[in-house]
């Protein structure tokens, strides 16, 4: 899917993705199968209040949270399985592993520009409520995290995305 998005971005134009539509559908199917077996984690957990309160589509809400969650993972545990992800991304995106996640965030922004949460109607006073809600209601997902995230961590992530 990354190589297809890279190609579509390089070709430009709003219809460039259509050349890879079947690949995107296949990748989405595989992702669904993988999620069913491995589960999801903080990105999805933190997306739920955004969709529930502000009706942000779940996929877009995931995109809004992804980079900041990953940065928090890197901050809390820079050495570990995250390095395997960096190696895989580096090979696909043609960049050194140390820059791989940033290259992914840039590609994601090229596909769909990430807007701050405030531009989706989220207010700053909602952020602590969302963080608390995620801790209280999404332990099934949070249990799959790369590292444990506290309510304070979640609030920090929401604030970064705000």
Task: For the regions a language model picked out, list residue spans one by one.
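Gly/Pro-rich interdomain helix-loop hinge
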Residues: 53-126
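Glycine-rich phosphate/pyrophosphate-binding beta-alpha loops
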Residues: 30-59, 139-141
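Short, amphipathic C-terminal "tail helix"
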Residues: 126-162
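Short glycine/serine- and small hydrophobic-enriched flexible loop segments
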Residues: 2-7, 29-30, 52, 67-74
């Amino acid at each position: 899917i990354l190589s297809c998005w890279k190609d579509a971005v390089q070709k430009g134009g709003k219809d460039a993705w259509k050349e890879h539509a079947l690949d995107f559908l296949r990748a989405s199917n595989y992702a669904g199968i993988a999620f069913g077996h491995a589960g999801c984690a903080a990105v999805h957990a933190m997306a739920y209040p955004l969709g529930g309160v502000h009706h942000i589509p779940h996929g877009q809400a995931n995109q809004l949270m992804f980079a900041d969650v990953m940065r928090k993972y890197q901050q809390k545990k820079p050495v570990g399985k995250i390095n395997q992800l960096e190696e895989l991304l580096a090979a696909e995106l043609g960049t050194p592993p140390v820059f791989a996640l940033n290259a992914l965030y840039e590609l994601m922004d090229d596909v769909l520009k990430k807007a701050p949460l405030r531009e989706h109607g989220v207010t700053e006073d909602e952020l602590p409520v969302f963080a608390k809600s995620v801790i209280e209601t999404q332990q099934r997902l949070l249990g799959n995290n790369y590292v444990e995230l506290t309510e304070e961590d979640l609030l920090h992530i929401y604030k970064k995305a705000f």
